[in-house]
Amino acid sequence: MRSQFKDEHPFERRKAEASRIRGKFLDRIPVICEKVEESDIPEIDKRKYLVPSDLTVGQFVYVIRKRIQLPSEKAIFIFVNDILPPTASLMSTIYEQYKDEDGFLYILYSGENTFGQLEGVEETL
């Protein structure tokens, strides 16, 4: 899935911005959070986040849920490189594993499990 942020901002500018952010805020992770285009879940009000390194994926999902005002009975899924990261994982761990070459971590969210693969889980038949 293509990132709208990547389409709107050239690579060198994104890389310079991520580098500046990481240099200025050592304990924060630069994250771009965007909605999966086909999803009927609400659009988020901003895409760029500076996330504390010690935040868990589950806590970040809570932040997204609050920003889009999603009721607790509605499902939300987040994807990093088409994988559902474990909710107990630290954002710093996910960042180190999946950060883009420009220095940002790209996260997509959806109301449906559109990609469907859990990290570290293989389907057996």
UniProtKB/Swiss-Prot annotation:
GO terms for cellular component: autophagosome membrane; cytoplasmic vesicle. The keyword Lyase does not apply. Induction: Expression is increased after the shift of cells from glucose to methanol. GO terms for biological process: autophagy; protein transport. Keywords: Autophagy, Cytoplasmic vesicle, Lipoprotein, Membrane, Protein transport, Transport, Ubl conjugation pathway, Vacuole. It is a lipid-anchor. It comes from the Eukaryota. The last C-terminal 9 residues are removed to expose Gly-116 at the C-terminus. The C-terminal Gly is then amidated with phosphatidylethanolamine by an activating system similar to that for ubiquitine. InterPro entries: Atg8-like, Ubiquitin-like_domsf. A lipid is attached at G116 (Phosphatidylethanolamine amidated glycine). The record marks G116, Q117 as: Cleavage. Residues 117-125 form a propeptide. It is found in: Cytoplasmic vesicle, Autophagosome membrane; Vacuole membrane. Its main location: membrane. Ubiquitin-like modifier involved in autophagosome formation. With ATG4, mediates the delivery of the autophagosomes to the vacuole via the microtubule cytoskeleton. Required for selective autophagic degradation of the nucleus (nucleophagy) as well as for mitophagy which contributes to regulate mitochondrial quantity and quality by eliminating the mitochondria to a basal level to fulfill cellular energy requirements and preventing excess ROS production. Participates also in membrane fusion events that take place in the early secretory pathway. PANTHER family: MICROTUBULE-ASSOCIATED PROTEINS 1A/1B LIGHT CHAIN 3-RELATED. Belongs to the ATG8 family. This is Autophagy-related protein 8.
